[in-house]
């Protein structure tokens, strides 16, 4: 019989509490556990809960994922991080604020739990639970334990069904996200040891991890290997999209003009090679290249790609139009940006969102066109969107400086304040600890009298 969801939650809480209290996983704990029978979902829930209590510090609760960081991801060096912690130097990146002692306890308890349910309850681990345990060891930076665990599990009778290509691919993705790209590459080359054969998804995963740290030479080597005549797993559209997107993003992150020119040239060359080999670019491929061209002031090439995608029947979406709107807003070609937004709505290619209106409003305010900025804010709110706190304050200040403060309806003010306050409350539930002022700042100011509201600027 499958345990109910409230019962599963109680069991997870009970086991996590036992881990925090450092209680041994023995027959005494087994007798007090009411999970009969154990299910794969319940075991996965326990393993997924361990990082939240042992790997994450209060200061990093609610932090953005690595792919949202502006700075390029770098290959992590555990010995260097350990030296920095001993010297009380701030460690940045995925390993920030991790307490090695807590992580070690969490890994120890996770392994005890993994083998405890086998011994006392006769639970047969499958591919999913072994994959979750391997990813847990990777997130805890225990690579020796990870290799030993995979070797031990793969040598079992059902080892071929437990350690599969899909599970190794998921592990490589986890290692890449944590900044351990060399370890992910080592896992890729160890697949044969675990009786697995890499497929196109495994190649795409390791190429993506290599591109994230800027190792394009190795990524191109793997792509060339996939392009060999008769290779079992040739590249697909996603393989080329990974490289095109990475060339554009990594070039802009370096901040070097020469590097930007080189990377954009490589991205366009990869796009032409993709067409030459008979692959059809999708909207994601076009969006990556168009966004890179817009952000590097290559608007002619971006418009050429835009027309090309429409000619080939690839329908642009909101992301495509937002790239042009941001470019036109930054260069003060506001009429072009507004025309792009109206075209998107007219052709039904997307619905304007906050990321569409915000650059337009900021550009109008900077060019002292507060009345038009106010009209866009009204249109935005009537569409069910809430402007950012900074955008709201910017428009209010611009209207006041031009003597148009009374033209914005009080009911509209109220709706925006309520939306801002609701969003602020949601953020506070996700990230209750705001120790770093560059992450979240709170401002209190008055608008139209005695009403205060908290403004969060990210």
UniProtKB/Swiss-Prot annotation:
PPR repeats lie at residues 164-198, 199-233, 236-271, 282-316, 317-351, 353-387, 388-419. InterPro entries: Mito_RNA-Proc/Resp (IPR051240), Pentatricopeptide_rpt (IPR002885), TPR-like_helical_dom_sf (IPR011990). Keywords: Repeat. It comes from the Eukaryota. Pfam families: PPR, PPR_2. The keyword Repeat applies. Belongs to the PPR family. P subfamily. This is Pentatricopeptide repeat-containing protein At1g77405. It comes from Arabidopsis thaliana (Mouse-ear cress).
């Amino acid at each position: 019989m499958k345990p109910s969801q409230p019962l599963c939650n109680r069991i997870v809480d009970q086991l996590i509490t036992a881990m925090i209290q450092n209680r041994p996983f023995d027959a005494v704990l087994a007798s007090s556990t009411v999970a009969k029978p154990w299910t794969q979902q319940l075991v996965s829930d326990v393993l997924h809960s361990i990082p939240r209590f042992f790997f994450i510090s209060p200061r990093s609760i609610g932090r953005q994922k690595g792919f949202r960081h502006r700075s390029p991801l770098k290959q992590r060096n555990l010995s260097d991080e350990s030296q920095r912690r001993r010297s009380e130097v701030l460690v940045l990146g995925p390993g920030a604020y991790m307490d090695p002692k807590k992580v070690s306890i969490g890994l120890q308890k996770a392994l005890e739990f993994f083998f405890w349910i086998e011994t006392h309850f006769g639970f047969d681990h499958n591919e999913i639970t072994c994959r979750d345990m391997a990813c847990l060891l990777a997130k805890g930076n225990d690579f020796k334990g990870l290799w030993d665990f995979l070797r031990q599990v793969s040598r079992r009778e059902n080892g071929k069904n437990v350690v599969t290509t899909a599970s190794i691919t998921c592990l490589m993705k986890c290692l890449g996200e944590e900044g351990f790209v060399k370890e992910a590459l080592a896992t890729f080359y160890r697949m044969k040891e675990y009786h697995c054969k890499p497929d196109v998804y495994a190649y795409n995963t390791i190429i993506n991890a290599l591109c994230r740290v800027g190792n394009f030479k190795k990524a191109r080597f793997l792509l060339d290997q996939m392009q060999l005549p008769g290779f079992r797993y040739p590249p697909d559209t996603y393989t080329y999209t990974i490289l095109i997107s990475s060339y554009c993003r990594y070039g802009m992150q370096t901040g070097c003009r020469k590097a930007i020119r080189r990377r954009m040239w490589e991205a366009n060359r990869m796009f032409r090679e993709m067409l030459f080999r008979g692959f059809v670019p999708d909207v994601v491929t076009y969006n990556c290249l168009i966004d890179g061209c817009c952000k590097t002031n290559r608007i002619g090439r971006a418009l050429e790609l835009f027309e090309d995608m429409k000619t080939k029947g690839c329908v642009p979406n909101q992301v495509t139009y937002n790239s042009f709107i941001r470019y036109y807003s930054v260069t003060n070609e506001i009429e072009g940006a507004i025309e792009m937004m109206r075209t998107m709505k007219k052709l039904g290619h997307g619905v304007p969102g906050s990321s569409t209106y915000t650059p337009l409003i900021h550009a109008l305010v900077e060019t002292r066109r507060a009345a038009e900025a106010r009209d866009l804010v009204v249109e935005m709110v009537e569409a069910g969107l809430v402007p950012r706190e900074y955008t709201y304050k910017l428009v209010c200040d611009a209207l006041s400086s031009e003597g148009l403060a009374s033209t914005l309806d009080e009911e509209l003010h109220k709706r925006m304040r309520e939306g801002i306050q609701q969003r602020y409350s949601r953020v506070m539930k996700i990230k209750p600890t705001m120790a770093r002022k560059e992450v979240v700042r709170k401002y209190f100011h008055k608008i139209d009298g005695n009403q205060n509201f908290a403004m969060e600027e990210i």
